[in-house]
Amino acid sequence: MRSLRERLRAGETLVGDGAWGTQLMARGLKPGESPDALSLSNPDALVEVADLYLDAGADLITTNSFGASPLNLERHGLDGRAEEINRAAVATLQRVVADRALVSASVGPTGRVLAPYG
């Protein structure tokens, strides 16, 4: 598979995946639970979602790691597990995606308002 850079330079239009949170809720994620923790506790759900988007023609699949910052994970009792969760999210997608698409990291906010604003 050509790299992202090569594909963009060639003017190729790329299609991304969709809403991971909605798909994970349909697979049992409860309100208030950390979707990022599923990278450890239920990687099969990630495989199912990625397969749906791949079958729909996505060229870019994002990791299940939007809220996997240390500060955000702390709120869910997952202190010190950010690296483990992020690595698991990437590894799971690399296995399922293989050479069918590109894997992109999803990086969200910390979940906290930091000084001087908060």
Positions of predicted regions on the chain:
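Domain-level signal for soluble alpha/beta catalytic cores
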Residues: 1-118
